[in-house]
């Protein structure tokens, strides 16, 4: 087997490694606003496989899940209903936030592209987390753990990302 030389990172590459995970808050806001503004888009977007965990921002995850839940229960998704669900949430001012979401909603013609971007960015975050887990496991490798175990765990994680998104 041919011996390969180790990869040596310079300080800039190490600093780049500490950057923020990929996300697009504007896309998340535009999608949520579009779903509130036009409830007919909800089924179309949920059929794409978009789930709450695909959103980067935690309260966007909550909002999306409530929208899907309300829609599945046959309820109209409106600012008024959402506001009442989130009025005890101290994280944001639900009144102005929901109005802002609707005001900045994506056009229904590009909504699928916006949803796909949110999904793709989520996949990238999951891949980065898997790579970081692999890196940590590789550095923490002990004599009682085989390299093949780490490879197998990583393969399983990648397969799950591929299957579940």
What kind of feature is each model-predicted range?
Residues 95-163:
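Extended, charged alpha-helical coiled-coil/arm scaffolds that mediate oligomerization and mechanical coupling
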Residues 1-123:
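Noncatalytic partner-interaction/assembly domains of nucleic-acid and motor enzyme complexes
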Residues 19-20, 73-77, 142-145, 160-165:
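Short, exposed beta-strand "edge-strand" segments with a Pro/Gly-rich flavor and a Y/T-containing core
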């Amino acid at each position: 087997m041919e011996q390969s030389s180790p990869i040596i990172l310079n300080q800039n590459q190490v600093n780049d490694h500490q950057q923020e995970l990929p996300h697009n808050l504007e896309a998340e806001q535009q999608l949520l606003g579009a779903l509130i503004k036009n409830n007919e888009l909800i089924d179309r977007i949920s059929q794409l496989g978009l789930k709450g965990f695909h959103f980067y921002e935690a309260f966007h995850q909550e909002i999306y899940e409530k929208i899907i839940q309300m829609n599945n229960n046959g309820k109209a998704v409106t600012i008024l209903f959402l506001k009442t669900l989130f009025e005890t949430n101290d994280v944001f001012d639900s009144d102005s936030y929901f109005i802002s979401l609707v005001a900045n909603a994506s056009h229904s013609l590009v909504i699928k592209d916006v949803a796909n971007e949110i999904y793709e960015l989520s996949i990238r975050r999951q891949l980065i987390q898997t790579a970081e887990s692999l890196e940590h496991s590789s550095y923490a490798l002990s004599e009682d753990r085989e390299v093949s175990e780490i490879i197998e765990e990583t393969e399983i994680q990648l397969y799950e990302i591929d299957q579940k998104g």
